[in-house]
């Protein structure tokens, strides 16, 4: 089994408890980050009806926020589709959002035509894509010229502030234990801090986006640098 296959299998295992663990472990703050991402992305869009693809959609949380924030701001949305390689996560998503379309596929092979989407989002998922550069090139293929890629992620912090050190302590010592208790899978929540430590810094992620044909519009970290929002436009 490849590393990517192991990650997908892990998410299949924790799918039934994933949403509850997320809310508890983030203390609900992740909802603020998701709303911020949607609102800011919409501010860069024009008046035409939007096609949105949420990659690594999991149980569909971000898809729900795109719909809700869009409705609140009278944004015209033609479609919102979710793509994820975990059938366990997608199964939960289909129960939560039966009116939305989900596809089981990796980030590197999106079931969409060239230049067909206005927004591609990936929330806390790009870190789990082993073939990351290939995925970014695939995002570029599917997006229209001027389309947006919206990334929310836990990034590696090479020079953490005092608050950042508190974040790291929480991630390494508290999160795996609580997540393990909720999901009965300690290993899955031990993976999170380990994967962050092995991931990119903000600067390196920005460089990869630019190398894949995007220009950065926005990049900022929130809540003790726990979460980073990046928005880039296809050239």
Provide a role label for each language-model segment:
Residues 1-19, 171:
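N-terminal, positively charged/glycine-rich alpha-helical extensions of SAM-dependent methyltransferases
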Residues 5-6, 152-208, 212, 218:
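C-terminal alpha-helical "lid/dimerization" subdomain adjacent to the S-adenosyl-L-methionine
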Residues 28-49, 65, 69:
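Conserved alpha-helix/loop element of class I SAM-dependent methyltransferases that forms part
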Residues 51-109:
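Class I SAM-dependent methyltransferase SAM/SAH-binding core
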Residues 108-120:
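A short acidic, Gly/Pro-enriched loop at the edge of an enzyme's catalytic core
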Residues 118-132:
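A short SAM/SAH-binding and catalytic strip from SAM-dependent methyltransferases
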Residues 133-148:
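A short glycine-rich, Lys/Arg-flanked "PGG" loop and its adjoining helix->strand segment in the class I
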